[in-house]
Amino acid sequence: ARFEITNRCTYTVWAASVPVGGGVQLNPGQSWSVDVPAGTKGARVWARTGCNFDGSGRGGCQTGDCGGVLDCKAYGAPPNTLAEYGLNGFNNLDFFDISLVDGFNVPMDFSPTSNGCTRGISCTADINGQCPSELKTQGGCNNPCTVFKTDQYCCNSGSCGPTDYSRFFKQRCPDAYSYPKDDPPSTFTCNGGTDYRVVFCP
């Protein structure tokens, strides 16, 4: 599957794609194409902001940092708006979602572009600007689990319900996962072999 990752923000982001892709700097208007093998699971695409890297690709980012390297091998540090997917899973379906379980840093659209699959997801609200003060952080809005680390928000025991904080995210981005046990409608499917695009600041 081909993933086209485009930065429509007015500022530079450092896109990340794991486990396939790594990371690149995307200036406003730039795109990056990643070819992802069939069967790839547990995959994420996200934007990093406020980064500084040296010539060898070492440094760090204000949001979404993946261990201080440009070429990500690991997931990013919250807060980061996540495009998550698994390809060719049950019944050869692709499963994809936008998740705010690790908080929000950059608005995002995640949509299929082929195979007759048309239902995409977007999360474009001004979550950073409206973020509750206790969740605010440099460059983003944290999920309460990151801040409070309690079972109520993190669902470590496997069962938990929505909270005022998760509703804050859900009201602004109804198609995105707002907490770990959020409703299944937050996950979307296409037939295997579909191509996708991720747009930052759509």
Swiss-Prot record:
InterPro entries: Osmotin/thaumatin-like_sf, Thaumatin, Thaumatin_CS
GO biological process: defense response
Disulfide bonding pattern of the chain: C9-C201, C51-C61, C66-C72, C117-C190, C123-C173, C131-C141, C145-C154, C155-C160
Signal peptide (from-to): none
Keyword tRNA-binding: no
Record-linked Pfam families: Thaumatin
The entry's keywords: Disulfide bond
Similarity-based family: Belongs to the thaumatin family.
Protein name: Protein P21
